[in-house]
Regions:
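Active-site proximal loop and beta-alpha junction motif in alpha/beta enzyme cores
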Residues: 1-71, 77-289
């Protein structure tokens, strides 16, 4: 069985950068097992399958090589960038149906895609010693004035602040322990960050999600939304900065990526979360399953 697919790099800062994703259009006739097989053959951290929806403009399902996930930021960017580039969608506002709910999408004039996230949920605060041990670092390398905490804007991630970019680049995690702790807290993985950056961004990040078959990811949309909310919540980003937050990721993998986050604030409360970016290298291909 041959399937037409598109591949592209979401959140790319350069042509080498970004997070690769697969996109399959008109996927209504595919079974869940066929979708999983296609995702496994492509081998990207996520592949998006675009289907018809009776609740929104489109329905999108997301598969890692191992399983289906509720939502994926970079594969959403990939899917809507591809639909826009192929003239299937024009500039404007759309709704996508996902397992995480119905979420708004905006396509801007340069195929720049912004997507709505759920309102932030701040959950468990985690012992720093436990996290440091799993990352093979000392507890003193974790920022003292910020918490290690599970935060979600659609998917639960563990926010881990470290003191410097240099320390962050040097981290070599114990993936078995990261996997165990992620599962213990029902989180996708760790979003580890430093408030230092290379090019004036608000933070420099690395993301580890071995429990989903992703040892490290070069650009993570949903975690970026959660991080933007976390930094505002703990006073590291003010209301003026909140509408234009930039995160760097993927540099340690030689895949430079830039993720934008926009928070709308009213009376010191977050009332809207958007995450977005560009994609590059749209290519048509065929896979056999």
């Amino acid at each position: 069985m041959k399937i037409n697919v598109y591949t592209l790099n979401s959140f790319a800062k350069t042509k080498e950068g970004g997070n690769p994703a697969g996109v399959v259009m008109n996927a209504d006739s595919l079974s869940e097992e066929e979708m999983r097989k296609i995702a496994a053959v492509l081998g990207f951290s996520e592949t998006a399958f675009v289907l018809q929806s009776n609740k929104a403009d489109v329905k999108v399902r997301f598969f890692t090589p191992d399983e289906e996930v509720d939502l994926c930021g970079h594969a959403t960017i990939a899917a809507f960038y591809a639909m826009s580039s192929l003239n299937l969608l024009k500039q404007g506002k759309y709704e996508q149906e996902t397992r995480a709910g119905i979420l708004g999408i905006e396509i801007h004039n340069d195929n720049f895609v912004m997507m709505d996230q759920s309102m932030p949920v701040f959950s468990e605060v985690i012992d720093k010693d436990e996290i440091a041990d799993s990352l093979n670092i000392s507890t003193s390398q974790i920022t003292s004035d910020l918490l290690v905490q599970v935060v979600s804007t659609g998917l639960r991630d563990i926010m881990v602040p470290v003191r410097s970019m240099e320390m962050l680049d040097a981290i070599r995690p114990d993936m078995k322990k990261v996997k165990e702790i992620s599962r213990k807290y029902n989180a996708v993985g760790y979003h580890v960050f430093s408030l230092e950056s290379l090019h004036g961004a608000n933070a420099y990040c690395r993301n580890f999600a071995p429990s989903y078959g992703i040892p490290e990811e070069s650009a993570t949309g949903t975690s970026s939304g959660a991080l933007g909310c976390y930094l505002y919540h703990y006073g590291k980003i003010n209301e003026e900065q909140a509408s234009h937050i930039i995160f760097e990721q993927g540099y340690s993998m030689k895949k430079p990526s830039e993720i934008r986050v926009s928070l709308a604030i009213r009376e010191n409360r977050i009332i809207e979360v958007k995450v977005g970016g560009k994609a590059m290298n749209l290519t048509a291909a065929e896979v056999e399953i």
